[in-house]
């Protein structure tokens, strides 16, 4: 019997569902799919769906990776809308990626294809510590303070 998976949808814990839905729709460009008042909502942009749950599931400060077509253009758009950019678009081996923070401290890592021929930049970890790429792989503490 085949029990194939159909996909995965991250559930992000939020403190105020109404404010979070407004943020995801107005600032990040998601559409509201459905909402159970004051409890749970589904938002979608393109092929990315996220569930938002008020206080009951998970922990604040979740991380989600979202593939996008153009991280640089999206960065400019989100910055113009006043969205908190935790870390600007930076090249890594897996993607050209930025970190965006929602109203509740959840981090959305949004990335497009890596830039060929460009070295990997520094990384901002979950504690706000900067890391630099280590030759041969991994990360070392340190980096610029800016």
Locations of regions flagged by a protein language model:
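Vicinal oxygen chelate
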Residues: 7-15, 44, 55-81, 96-101, ...
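Core segments of cupin and vicinal oxygen chelate
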Residues: 2-5, 11-50, 56
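N-terminal beta-strand motif that seeds the catalytic metal site of vicinal oxygen chelate
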Residues: 1-21, 62-64, 112-146
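Generic preference for hydrophobic
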Residues: 50-52, 100, 110
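A short acidic/small-residue loop/turn micro-motif
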Residues: 40, 93, 113-117
